[in-house]
Amino acid sequence: MKEYKSVCPYDCPDACGLILTVDDNKVTKVRGNKEHAFTRGILCPKMAHYERVIHSPKRLMTPLRRIGKKGIGPDQFTPISWDEALERIVENFNHTINTYGSESILRYSYAGTMGAVNSPAADYFFRCIGATSQDRGICSPAKQAAFKSVYGDTVAIKPQEAQHSDLIILWSLNATATDVHILHDVNVAKRNGAFVWIIDTHKTYTYDQGTHHVYVKPGSDGALALGMIHIIHRDGLEDTTFIQAYVQGYDELVRDVLPTFTPEYVSSICGVPVEIIEELAHAYAKAKAPFIRLGSGVSRYGNGAMSCRCINALPAVVGAWQHLGGGLLSSSSSSQYFNKSFMQQPNTPTPSKRMMPMILLGDLLTNPKALLEHGLEDTSGGVPVHSLYIFSSNPAITAPNQNLVRQGLMRDDLFTVVHERFFTDTCAYADIILPATSSAESDDIFNSYGHYTIAASYQAIPPVGESKSNWQVISELAQRMGLDDSFFAMTERELIEHMVRNSSKLSQDEQDAILRGDLVEVALPDNYKMDFKTPSGKIEILNPRESIPLITYTEPYGDDEPFWLIIGNDIRILDSSFCELEFDDSELMKLRMHPDDAALYNINNSDAVEIYNNRGAVRIKVYLDDTVQRGTLVTLGVWWQSQSSDAKVGINAVTASRPTDEAWGSTFYDVQVNIRKV
C-alpha cells in the first residue's frame, strides 16, 4: 500500500489537494491533503469517492469503431486496436485536408481536465495541420472580460482574505456546490461577527450560510449594483478620497447614469423590495472591509459582461481595496506563475484565421457560413467541417442549442473521433472512440482559478485497460502525421519540468518543491491589491476602449415565453461529469415551480410536464416549491440523456447559442420557456 499526492482535475475553482491510497495498482481511497493552503484537507461530495470513477465498470477499456447507426448507443460499436484506430484517424485527416482543405478539421475540447499539459494538449497539433481553431471560452469569459475592463491585469485578491471581512457578499455563487472551500473563510469571518449576504436568482444549497438573502430576477444583477451605488452616493457614503486617487469615471457615472437608478426603478427591474435594496447598500457602504465573491452565473446572460462590470465597480466606490479583507474575487491569477504558454508553442505556426467560438458548434456543423453570418473572420470562405476531434468535453449534452448540435453530429459526411473515459452522449455519434485515462493514470500540473496554490500530480496507477492520456494520443497522431517536431516527443513529466523551470515568477525553492510533488502557494507582491494594472493606473469604471465606455445597465436577451428557466448546479455532478456514477434518486432531472404559477396551468405536484420554446422541448417531472420566484422555473444539473425524464434530450435542448455582450461566452441562463402538462 502506498500514498500519492494528487490534485482534483475537474473544472472547479478549488483544485483540491488529494491523497490517493494505492494497493495492488488500484486506488482504494481518496482523501483531502491537509497541507493545502485553501482546501485544507476537505473534499466535496463529488470527489470523496473518486476511486469509484477511476475503477468504474463503465470505463471504456479499448478503442471502438462504429459499425452501426449514429446516435444509438454502445451496441453500434466494435473493439479495435490502437493501431487501427490511429491509422483510421490519420487516413481521414489526410483525406480531409487533400479534398476539402485543412480548415475542414475542427477540434472541440474544454475542461474535462484542467491540467496544464492535458487540457491544451491538442492546441499546437491542430495548429500545425491548419485546422479550424476553437475559442475555448464557454463558461465565464464575459466575467473575465469584465474584470479586465475595470481592473486590467491587476492581481486578484486571495480568497483567504475573506476571513478578515466584516461583510461578505456571495453574489451568484452557490458555493456549497461549486466553491465549497471559500465557506471555511466565510465561517471564520462569521465567527468574528461578519454578515453574509447571498444574492442569487433562487434558493440554493448555500442558503444556510447566509445571514441575509436577496433574490433577483434573472439578468438584473447589474441594475442592483447600480442601485446600490446610487444610494451610496445619495447618502454620501462613498470614499471620495479613494475615488479621486484611484477611480476613473466616477464623476461621469454620477452625472450620466446614477440619477436613473433610483431604488424604486431598480426594484421594478430586479424584483427586490426597495427597503432591501436600501439595507444592502447601507450595509455594504458602512462595512470596513466588504468582500464580494462573484460567481459565474451572472455572466451567462446576454448582458453578462456589463452586469459584472457594474458589480466590479462596487469595491471601488467604497474604497474596499485599501483594507485587509476588502475587495472582490472574480477569479484568481495563478496561471501566470509558471510557463503554461509553452504548450501553445506561441512562436511557431500561427492559428488559422477561422476560429469557432464554442457556443457555435451546432451552428457551424449545420451551416458552413455560420461564422461569416455572425460577423466572424473565416478565410476559408465557409468550408464545411468534415472531421471533428472531441476530447475533455461532452457537447451532445453540454453545448447550447442541443438539437442543432445533434443534427450536426448526425451528418453522414462528418467523421467524428471522441476521446473519453465513459460512453457519454457524444460517444453515440462517434466513428472512432478512444479510451482516456483519469488523472490518477497520467502526469500533469495544476493551477487554480480560485486560489494561488500550484501542484504537480504524478501518475499513481497504470492506465486502466488500454486508456491513454490526451497528450499521449496527440503525440502519436503527430508522429503518424509526419510532424517532425521535438515538442511532440516530450513526455508529460518533461513538459511539466520545462514549464516550471522556465518561470521567472517562481523561486528555485518553489520550483524544486513543485517538481517534488509538494503544494506551493505562490507569494503575491506587497500591496498587490492597490497596484491597479490598467492603462490609466486607476480602476476604470469608464473604459474608453469599450464599445460602451461607462458602466450602465443593459438588458438580457430573454425570449417570448412566460418563464425564466434557471439551470442551477447539482451538488452531485459538475456539468455532465460524474453522471457515470450510480445515484439512489430515481428522478435525477427535476423541475421546481412556484405553486401559484402551477395553479394557473392546472399543474399539480409531481406531474409530468414539458417545457418548451422555439429551440426544443424537454419532458420533466415538476415539484411545487414556494421558495421559487414567481415567473421562474428551476432545475439542477446537466444530466446525461439516459438520466433525463424521457431519455430523449437534455436540458440544453431549450438553451440558445447566442453570445454574451463580450468575449463570446455562453448564455445558458438567458433562456425563457413555456410549460404544459403531458
Positions of the model-derived regions?
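Phosphate/diphosphate-binding loops
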Residues: 7, 405, 411-415, 419-423, ...
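N-terminal export/assembly segments and adjacent metallocofactor-ligating motifs
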Residues: 1-235, 273, 391, 599, ...
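Active-site phosphate/pyrophosphate-binding segments
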Residues: 228, 248-370
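N-terminal leader/propeptide and maturation segments of large enzyme subunits in energy/redox metabolism
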Residues: 66-79, 84, 230, 235-274, ...
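Extended redox/cofactor-interaction regions of prokaryotic respiratory oxidoreductases
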Residues: 119-199, 222-226, 315-428, 437-445, ...
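Long, contiguous, secondary-structure-rich segments that constitute the structural scaffold
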Residues: 464, 470-517, 576, 581-591, ...
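Short beta-alpha connecting loops at secondary-structure transitions
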Residues: 208-216, 437-440, 452-464, 584
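Flexible glycine/proline-enriched surface loops and loop-helix/loop-strand junctions
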Residues: 69, 209-210, 261-265, 293-298, ...
